[in-house]
UniProtKB/Swiss-Prot annotation:
Keywords: Acyltransferase, Cell shape, Cell wall biogenesis/degradation, Cytoplasm, Magnesium, Metal-binding, Multifunctional enzyme, Nucleotidyltransferase, Peptidoglycan synthesis, Repeat, Transferase
Residues noted as binding acetyl-CoA in the record, renumbered to the chain: A393, N399, Y400, S418, A436
Protein name: Bifunctional protein GlmU
Entry EC number(s): 2.7.7.23, 2.3.1.157
Bias (Basic and acidic residues) ranges: 488-497
Subcellular location: Cytoplasm
Any one Gene Ontology cellular component term annotated for this protein: membrane
Region of interest: Disordered: 473-497
Entry's cofactor comment: Binds 1 Mg(2+) ion per subunit.
Amino-acid positions noted as binding Mg(2+) in the UniProt annotation, renumbered to this chain: D118, N241
Keyword Cytoplasm: yes
Gene3D superfamilies: Hexapeptide repeat proteins, Spore Coat Polysaccharide Biosynthesis Protein SpsA, Chain A
Amino acid sequence: MTSSTTSSTDTAVLVLAAGAGTRMRSDIPKVLHTLGGRSMLAHALHTVAKVAPQHLVVVLGHDRERIAPAVEALATDLGRPIDVAIQDQQLGTGHAAECGLAALPEDFTGVVVVTAGDVPLLDADTMADLLATHGSAAATVLTTTVDDPTGYGRILRTQDNEVTSIVEQADASPSQRAIREVNAGVYAFDITALRSALRRLRSDNAQHELYLTDVIAIFRQDGLSVRARHVDDSALVAGVNDRVQLAALGAELNRRIVTAHQRAGVTVIDPGSTWIDVDVTIGRDTVIRPGTQLLGRTRVGGRCDVGPDTTLSDVTVGDGASVVRTHGSESLIGAGATVGPFTYLRPGTALGAEGKLGAFVETKNATIGAGTKVPHLTYVGDADIGEHSNIGASSVFVNYDGETKNRTTIGSHVRTGSDTMFVAPVTVGDGAYTGAGTVIRRNVPPGALAVSAGSQRNIEGWVVRKRPGSAAARAAERASGEAAEQALGHHDDSQGS
């Protein structure tokens, strides 16, 4: 990154986010569509915040009632003020920039950077390079070269390679449309020169709009300096206009995220099937297996084994844990714990160190202590389980009575038999046991054995009498006959001896 000669305290940034985004064909405002776990607007504002400008303004127009709360939330998240300017009528990018300038203090005399809310991969290094190139020029524009320039404004240069103007796609001649160097839509301006040029913009073009790009030609006519900074990596300045482009940039962002984790010491077995959001952290020597999605603010420690076919959203995984074929959200998995396969961790789950949640276990709002095992086929909801306990297969924590959710408390070193039902609210004391098939409706004292099932009673011949002719009845009759023959044979042998 080139060091900037412009202090961030002399810089204001305008983020243009007023457009309707009709090509998205969506009821969601375009800049609120997400990739990598952030909205496009969030990507833009996170990048700008790293440059630390003195002033930051977001220009809103279409759907501003829905976007403004997102801006407010991002201001809180970033810990800095963000002003909002309103473009009541969408009269073009030049008009949007004018609306943004109106939100700046009248005595501000520094550099104004104008960028867009739909350029999600733009990074702080590129913005810093723009400012370093700009110096004392009237304008500096980021450009890039693309294979297919359709839809972009073309960069026109003199024989001496000086930028003379930017011509939009709709207004370009056939020869101009063949130019592959395009406007990236990110600029640095001297604020005095920009204000003067904006007052002279005209809408006599194909779209009848006030183009911000037209200020470049005005600067040149006034004899002012115009500079360009070429961005070799065109993805950094690519915009999103439809869902195809959103998916393409999402895949490119994911590729970069996965590569960064690999270079930091994480093994990703199949990068093509692995999705990692931008705010996810992963420790060294962790293995990420195919089909894994790590979303939101998930935190994975070192030496973990995650996947295959696992989705974790806002989950913290301790060092050395194993998580296999699991879907989890807003949960905590302790160090050295094992989860899966086919485990569902709902919000509020906290599994202690060296604990286990096995096959076909579902948990919700439950704290499970260190070393405790819930091996298989169990629902644990609204519960607190102590350390080093074992919950038998097919157990159910009956937490809902039709009106309210109630909690179950299980102590430490408890052993529960298979198919135990805990009807909340109920407490099982430390060291207690429950028999298989027990329904726990009352508290169990520490060290007690709880058994609720009565004595088993066998009704002989019930199937033959009640289901005559059925396959079960025929099988029972055959088995009874064979048993009778065996008994007779045994009797004859006894008589013969």
